Amino acid sequence: MTDDFFKITDAIDRAALHSTFLKGLIDRQPALVEAIKTGNFDVSEVEEEMPVARRLRLDRRAVALTVAIGDLSGLFDLTEVTRRLSAFADRALDIAIRTAIAERTPDAESKGFAALALGKQGSFELNYSSDIDPILIYDPDTLPRRGREEPEEAAVRIGRRVVELLQARDADGYVLRVDLRLRPSPEITPIVLPVDAAISYYESQALAWERAAFIRARAAAGDRALGQRFLDEISPFVWRRGLDFGAVREIRAMSHRIRDHYSAGQLFGPGYDLKRGRGGIREAEFFAQIHQLIHGGRDPS
């Protein structure tokens, strides 16, 4: 037996002892546990004949357990943990998009609909409990749709089905929490944006915080060529080579709003919120993003 075997079995024992959630996964997936003991961290109990929604949820359970054991055993470093969790989110989102299109137009090619990963998913930094914040876009000219259906109507129905596949809960849990509020004016805009209108908006009307949202963006799922075309088109907006006084004032105002929103007067001491308190994780993150917005257009490094 190798050193890795003892590290893995010890990690499984500790997980079962100290985590109710992981103990439940271990008890429900004995075959998966035995595979992990052999060093196979890419194993899954998914069967092809299963409904897609169930396959996704079982795949999510397998990823949660394999990554946790790899993490606890020391065989995965932090980069590998977040990479695997982010790669799963990409894969699940892609499957959900293709399924939603195929359910409505079985004979059509799955194209014309893309998901852009932002934030931690965009930079392959998802953690165990992260939700995802994609922006969904579509091409009216290539999106498959039924009969007399308008492109926007088809896109919104596909988008709703994607969210349903990922968020619906049953005895197997759920796949991912999905937050679509990073799109422009989410209270009045459809959940899926036509690509040309989205490009026009970001080129002419978007605010500094919307630029910041795209710092880590990438085409993650669906029609990736469409997603990449969109990102290429708005790149000059995100990474400006020059800033006028209005842009500087806007960035400064964003910085002040962030501090006011997250710090809430909190100082170090009992009850301090490490994530949202003054000088905490969120404020440090936005500090870095502000400097990226200022300098990134002239210094890509």
Predicted regions and their residues:
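A nucleotide- and high-energy phosphate-metabolite-utilizing enzyme signature
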Residues: 1-301
